[in-house]
Each structure stands twice: as C-alpha cells, then as structure tokens.
Amino acid sequence: MASTNISDREKALNAALAQIERSFGKGAIMRLGDATQMRVETISTGALTLDLALGGGLPKGRIVEIYGPESSGKTTLALHAVAATQQAGGVAAFVDAEHALDPVYSKALGVDIDNLLVAQPDNGESALEIVDQLVRSTAVDIIVVDSVAALVPRAEIEGEMGDTSVGSQARLMSKAMRKIAGNIGRSGCLVIFLNQLRQKIGVTYGSPEVTTGGNALKFYASVRLDIRRIQTLKKGTEGEYGIRAKVKVAKNKVAPPFRIAEFDIIFGQGISRMGCTIDLAEKCEVITRKGAWYSYNGENIAQGRDNAMKYLEENPEIAATIDQQVREKLSLVNAVFPVETEDGAEEQGEDGDF
C-alpha cells in the first residue's frame, strides 16, 4: 500500500513538473542535482589575494557591490574585472553615472576601450533601464555601474534645489533590484555596483558609516566588498607611487565570507600582480624569506620586497612558474575564469587573511 502511494505521488510530481515546464519554459524548475552547471563561474579581480578570499573571483550571474571611501580603489578593482572579462572574449559595459571614466587609465589597466560599451545617462532611471536592457539581451558578460550615489532620480533633477525628496533614491534602487535580479541569473551577466559611504548622525554604538541608495542593494548583492586604503606607498626621494588596499568580504553567498585580502595599487598601472604573487608565494612557501632576502629553489633572488617584485618583472618565465605553483597550491589554476571547487573551499577555509 505504501509503495503504491509513493508511486502515485511520484507520478503526480512528474506531471506537475512537466506542466510547469510547458507553461514557463524548460529549466523553470529542476532538481538541484540535475542542474547542468553546479559550480559558479567567476571572473578574476586582478588581485590573486582577493580571488582567493572570494573563493575564485567575482561570481557570474550575480550582483556585486564594492563600497569604500574616496580614492580607495573601487573603480580600479572594477576595471580590472572588465579587463579580465574582455581578455576571455566577453563583452563589457560601463555605466558612467559620475561622468568620470578615464579612458587613458582604463587602457593602462588592460581594458579594450575600443570595444567597451559606455553609457553616461542623465538620471538614475535611465541608467538602471540601460542596465536592465543590457542584462535582458544576454549578450553582455559584465556591467559596471559607477556609482549608486550618482543615480539621481529624475524628479530630483527636474525639481528645485531646495525641494526635499526623502527616500526617492532608495525606492528607485528597490524597484530596479526587483526587475534586474531575476534576469541576471538567466543571462549569466555579472553586475557590479560601486557605492560611496556616508556618515549617520547621532550614532553612539557601532559604525556610523552607511552606503547610499537604501538597503535593497545589500540584500540582492551576492557579494559585498569593503575596500579601504591602509597605507601610502613611498619610495625614497621619488615620493608616493601607490597605495596598499585592504578588502574585507563583508558578504558572500557563494563562498565563506568575512575573509580579508590586501594588495598594492600602483598609480597609473593598477593592481600590482607581482606584489600579490610574492605575498602568496611566501605564504605558500614557494618563495622563502630570511631576513630581507627572498629565495626561490634555494637561491637568493633579491633583497627586499620591491627588489623581489622587480626581479620577477625582469624574469617573466620565472614569474609565470611561481604564479602557476601558487595557483596549484591554492586550487586557482584558471587565470581568467577560475571555478571554485569543494576541495579548494576546504583548503581556503583554514585561513581568513591573505
């Protein structure tokens, strides 16, 4: 009797699933184990330390928020992701709501500016409508919105300077997230929102910092990155040549959150790949350090971190070998679209800082 009931329930379930697929299309509902692609594809951030902290990189088909103070590296990080996408043959779009995109700097970071789609909308509604249409097209692999704070509602732009419009931007973002979120998963497009910080007034306990645009983006984002400048890089009499950035993974739905990554950003050049390689190679014991001396395969290669980076830049074959050894030890073999594996997640879970 029990087996008959189970058989009847299975038939009823299969009939319901078939009806749902006829009504809403193939793939509208499925058993999780039957999914054709179980693992989330990712896009490199340009910083190997951050890729590791994210479990492979920025996830495709998701919303990502990057926020932090001014001049902390938000746009640089996003442009590196754009460059990685283009190098893999993907299509990239940049919604420049701040009207501040620098083509020369973008090109220096590896962005193909001739094929980069750029929009400079006049108001927030236009910007988010452009994003929605690009996502629906399923032909774009990555979209960067710079920034949420510059997505000013049309009513606020057309109104007087003294008019009050409480919560208008938050309502705009909430509606946009509802429209965009469903389409992103089907298109496989990565949408990156850059955001600014504001100070809450009268906060006694906890951080007074808050991101603009309300709470909708916080909930819909699969990954939230908090990027800060922790050090200014100086070299003798040459003065400042870059910054040391620290990124905290404040939220991550596809890998363990709350990890921390650090990397160098060189003015005019972007994220220092060699700096990330040296840091991780030392951590993985591919390169050893005794005092100020760095050694590889038992031979001293340079004295001091800057000289070690210079040595790798002058010896690209050795640098490529070290980079490959580091990626193999950390289960990050694919340079452009690394895929998180179960083994890699377990290995990475042992350490929180990179």
Curated annotation (Swiss-Prot):
Cellular compartments annotated: Cytoplasm
CC terms in the record's Gene Ontology section: cytoplasm
Q: Which InterPro entries match?
A: AAA+_ATPase, DNA_recomb/repair_RecA, DNA_recomb/repair_RecA_CS, P-loop_NTPase, RecA-like_C, RecA-like_N, RecA_ATP-bd, RecA_C_sf
Q: What CDD domains does the entry give?
A: RecA
Name the Gene Ontology molecular function terms of this record: ATP binding; ATP hydrolysis activity; ATP-dependent DNA damage sensor activity; damaged DNA binding; single-stranded DNA binding
Q: What induces it?
A: Expressed in light grown cells, strongly repressed post-transcriptionally by UV-C light, repressed by H(2)O(2) and SeO(4) but not by SeO(3).
Q: Which residues make up the binding site for ATP? A: G68, P69, E70, S71, S72, G73, K74, T75
Could you confirm whether the keyword Transcription regulation appears in this record? no
Gene Ontology biological process terms in this record: DNA recombination; DNA repair; SOS response
Assign the protein's first listed, main location to one coarse class: cytoplasm
Alphabetically sorted, this entry's keywords are: ATP-binding, Cytoplasm, DNA recombination, DNA-binding, Nucleotide-binding
Top-level taxonomic group? Bacteria
Under the heading PANTHER family, the entry gives:
MITOCHONDRIAL DNA REPAIR PROTEIN RECA HOMOLOG-RELATED, RECA
Q: What else is known?
A: This bacterium is considerably more resistant to UV and gamma irradiation than E.coli; the E.coli-like SOS regulon model is not an appropriate model for DNA repair in this cyanobacterium.
Family designation: Belongs to the RecA family.
Q: What does this protein do?
A: Can catalyze the hydrolysis of ATP in the presence of single-stranded DNA, the ATP-dependent uptake of single-stranded DNA by duplex DNA, and the ATP-dependent hybridization of homologous single-stranded DNAs. It interacts with LexA causing its activation and leading to its autocatalytic cleavage.
Name of protein: Protein RecA
Which species does the entry assign this protein to? Answer: Synechocystis sp. (strain ATCC 27184 / PCC 6803 / Kazusa)
Q: What is the organism lineage in this UniProt record?
A: Bacteria, Bacillati, Cyanobacteriota, Cyanophyceae, Synechococcales
